């Protein structure tokens, strides 16, 4: 499933420089489990892309991604439990931001995504363009 405009050239804009950066093994394992190892992986990565571009609340994410609100909330819970996003606020309109773990480990996240894509090697089964 190629990603829509949420991920194109937003989160991985410096991808050309990633080949020279060493991948963190712990982060590789974490990203592998969250973004490739369980159901909802595409949704979680799309959420990361969306909030990296513009931090927003769950309702706005639901509309922007054209997904059910409960689906968004479940994915947000998984991302929060793994400290990959930060919640600001105390209620329905909470705004979500990517954590420092995401921003400081983009090359590792990119490596995980590309490794899975290489295993899939099927047309139409891409995380990112």
Specify the residue positions occupied by each region the protein language model found:
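Amphipathic alpha-helical dimerization/coiled-coil segments
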Residues: 2-30, 101-129
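Short capping segments at the starts of secondary-structure elements
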Residues: 40, 53-57
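N-terminal positioning helix adjacent to the helix-turn-helix/winged-helix DNA-binding module
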Residues: 40-43, 94
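Pre-recognition alpha-helix immediately N-terminal to the DNA-recognition helix
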Residues: 45-49
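A short acidic, leucine-rich amphipathic alpha-helix
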Residues: 60-64
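Alpha-helical DNA-recognition elements
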Residues: 78
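Glycine-centered, phosphate/nucleic-acid-interacting loop/turn motifs that mediate DNA/RNA or nucleotide
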Residues: 82-83
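Short, Lys/Arg-rich nucleic-acid/phosphate-binding segment
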Residues: 89-96, 101
